[in-house]
A protein has these predicted regions:
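Conserved alpha/beta-hydrolase "acid-adjacent" motif
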Residues: 233-239
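Conserved HGGG/HGGXW glycine-rich cap/lid loop of the alpha/beta-hydrolase fold
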Residues: 12-68
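Short beta-strand/loop motif that positions the catalytic acidic residue
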Residues: 220, 226-228
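Catalytic active-site module of serine/aspartate enzymes centered on a nucleophile-bearing elbow/loop
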Residues: 250-281
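Short glycine-enriched nucleophile-adjacent loop
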Residues: 106-117, 123
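Conserved alpha/beta-hydrolase catalytic His-Asp/Glu region
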Residues: 158-200
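Active-site loop/oxyanion-hole signature of alpha/beta-hydrolase fold enzymes
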Residues: 63-100
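Flexible "cap/lid" loop of the alpha/beta hydrolase fold
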Residues: 121-155
Length: 281
């Protein structure tokens, strides 16, 4: 893998890293809210690159080494994060890319496919949602966690790590694949390279989100693969089923014994599925 690099994309500085050979089909990995590039683990990226893909991961604004903003005052909206993805393709001189988005990143990927279809070779949507009042609600446990007004002391790295670990445990929905002892060092490493922990954990939830993408799903014209945990407590399976119905020719793969996370145990399904889906340029 290449060293991390600060790139000028969509008018801001974003930190990105690449794996594999530039001549191979490009995959841009777009993660969810409050997550830096490290949420796409090194081994996951390496497995995709070993399948002859040029893999790009990056830090969203307010995560990792990318541009930061004051806590509670993000100087951007959801649309800006979507344009950041296209800006990274520009910065890397990539005319097109296969977009792989997880959670919020899936929404950004769908938005990019709608607004910049000529730049998007395909979509892979992991644990994401198109939004809509008719879709199943979050689990009571997750909703209680995210609406709890009590916040940890973000200046205390241990307290921040405890908070994130609790959130991920709830997202895992009791999956036997969740290992808190292995997860905690990954969280600590991610937080250690974050400019402002409070901003990273608050600002993506404070930004303006814009209009729901649901009414426009039928306009998506790029090949679309949907990978979704059967036990997802954040976006229950009905969210994925709605996308599979409403995005033309979309294909849904349900991940057994899986919640909102993408644990290593399901990579044996996820990685080959992505490689097969992105075999064209």
């Amino acid at each position: 893998m290449a060293k991390e690099a600060i790139l000028r994309a969509n008018g801001v500085d974003l930190c990105a890293q690449t794996f594999g050979r530039r001549r191979d089909p490009a995959i841009l990995l777009i993660h969810g809210a409050a997550a830096s590039m490290l949420a796409w683990e090194d081994d996951f990226c390496a497995r995709l690159a070993a399948g002859s893909r040029f893999v790009v991961r990056y830090d969203h604004r307010d995560t990792g080494r990318s541009v930061g903003y004051p806590p509670g005052r993000p100087g951007y909206a959801m649309r800006d994060l979507m344009e950041d993805a296209i800006g990274l393709l520009d910065a890397l001189d990539l005319p097109r890319g296969h977009l792989v988005g997880r959670s919020m990143g899936g929404g950004l990927a769908m938005g990019a496919a709608l607004e910049h279809p000529e730049r998007v070779a395909s979509l892979t949507l992991l644990a994401t949602s198109p939004g809509g009042p008719d879709l199943p609600p979050m689990s009571k446990e997750f909703l209680a966690f995210v609406t709890n007004p009590r916040q940890p002391d973000w200046s205390d790295p241990d307290a921040a790590a405890d908070h994130v670990l609790t959130m991920l445990r709830i997202m895992a929905a009791g999956s036997r694949h969740f290992d808190a002892k292995k997860m905690r060092p990954l969280i600590q490493h991610e937080l250690s390279r974050t400019r402002n922990i409070a901003s990273s954990q608050i600002n993506h939830f404070a930004m303006a989100t814009g209009e729901l993408i649901r009414p426009r799903l039928g306009e998506i014209r790029v090949p679309t693969l949907i990978l979704h945990g059967e036990d997802d407590p954040v976006f229950p399976l009905g969210h994925a089923q709605a996308m599979a119905r409403e995005i033309p020719d979309a294909h849904l793969v349900v991940l057994k014994e899986t919640g909102h996370l993408v644990p290593r145990a399901v990579w044996r399904t996820v990685v080959p599925a992505i490689l097969s889906h992105t075999a064209h340029r």
